[in-house]
Amino acid sequence: MKNSMAEPNHSINYEKYALITGACGLLGKKHAEALLEIGTSIVLTDIDLDLLKKTKRDLELMSYEGKVIYYLMDVSSEDSIIKVSNELIKQNIRIDILINNAAINPKASSLKNNIRTTRLETFSIKRWDLELAVGLTGSFLCSKIFGGLMAEDNKGGIILNIASDLSVIAPD
């Protein structure tokens, strides 16, 4: 008698797409690799076209099954996000997974200097506004636009918001 318990299928249909914001950063690349490994196609988004091209090449060299495409997108600009969503709709690409990963991330080489400039008493309002525009407003706008499209066709989807460990662990 055959076992009636089916083996779990850990792969995702190749027709599923995940959009990753801040895709050219370390975490963005790791999210892309993990999703490609299980067969999900990836839409990389970031604000640096050269880094997007390089990240796409690097991921394609790993020979995953999923497709990799990219778009220049500024998460702090609703117009930029709408432009990308419209392009995806034109190409018949539905976003099934949204990973809100974009953030302002100082390079490790400037960490010592960054600690001095990120102390509350020296933190500029300009830097504050930028951090909120990318990390908070960007996640809101992407969730609003892509989440709205997920809800519109009643197929649902996944929205994953990535936060820094500094949200729970003080840097010093």
What annotation goes with each model-predicted range?
Residues 10-43:
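Canonical Rossmann dinucleotide-binding motif of NAD(H)/NADP(H)-dependent dehydrogenases/reductases
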Residues 16, 65, 94-95, 111, ...:
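Active-site loop of short-chain dehydrogenase/reductase
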Residues 21, 95-112, 135, 161-164:
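Rossmann-fold scaffold of SDR-type NAD(P)-dependent oxidoreductases
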Residues 40-54:
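Conserved glycine-rich Rossmann-like NAD(P)H-binding loop of the short-chain dehydrogenase/reductase
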Residues 49-50, 72-84, 125:
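The beta1-alpha1 cofactor-binding region of Rossmann-like NAD(H)/NADP(H)-dependent oxidoreductases
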Residues 64-67, 87-100, 106, 124, ...:
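A glycine-rich helix->loop->beta "capping" turn
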Residues 84, 99, 142-146:
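Hydrophobic positions on the long internal alpha-helix
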Residues 104, 116-141, 160:
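Catalytic Tyr-X3-Lys loop
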